[in-house]
Amino acid sequence: MTKDAVNLDAYTVSFMPFYTEYQGPTEEFKDYKFEDTIYFRGKELKREKSATPSSSDNTTSNTFSNGAILSGNTITGKIVSVNNYEREGTDRNELARLQELISLIDVINQ
């Protein structure tokens, strides 16, 4: 997807948020809550820091009608499910942890 797309709603976002290919060190997700705002950028998945958007942010980002925000390669969404379980400490479970703890809502238009 390119930023110069005229009608963003006509495009399909090209990643599946439930199956990110994230590997490596992660943020600690155990304190995340339902409806927390997060963002997905490349292979990073982090909670959004509270901040007041500047006027320059408005000129470099586009907003989908469903509320998802496209800014460069960043997609913003909200946590829609939080499933707590004990961390097993293996690399494979890092990916499973991300898939089970965090879901993005209304990112892919259908």
Curated annotation (Swiss-Prot):
Subcellular location: Cytoplasm; Nucleus
Entry's family note: Belongs to the RNase H2 subunit C family. Highly divergent.
Ranges of biased composition (kind: Low complexity): 51-66
Chain intervals for the UniProt region annotation (Disordered): 45-69
Species, as recorded: Saccharomyces cerevisiae (strain ATCC 204508 / S288c)
Chain's role: Non catalytic subunit of RNase H2, an endonuclease that specifically degrades the RNA of RNA:DNA hybrids. Participates in DNA replication, possibly by mediating the removal of lagging-strand Okazaki fragment RNA primers during DNA replication. Mediates the excision of single ribonucleotides from DNA:RNA duplexes.
Quaternary context: The RNase 2 complex is a heterotrimer composed of the catalytic subunit RNH201 and of the non-catalytic subunits RNH202 and RNH203.
Additional comment: Present with 556 molecules/cell in log phase SD medium.
UniProt keyword terms in alphabetical order: Cytoplasm, Nucleus
Domain of life, per lineage: Eukaryota
GO cellular component terms listed in the entry, alphabetical order: cytoplasm; nucleus; ribonuclease H2 complex
Biological process annotations from GO: mismatch repair; RNA catabolic process
Name recorded for this polypeptide: Ribonuclease H2 subunit C
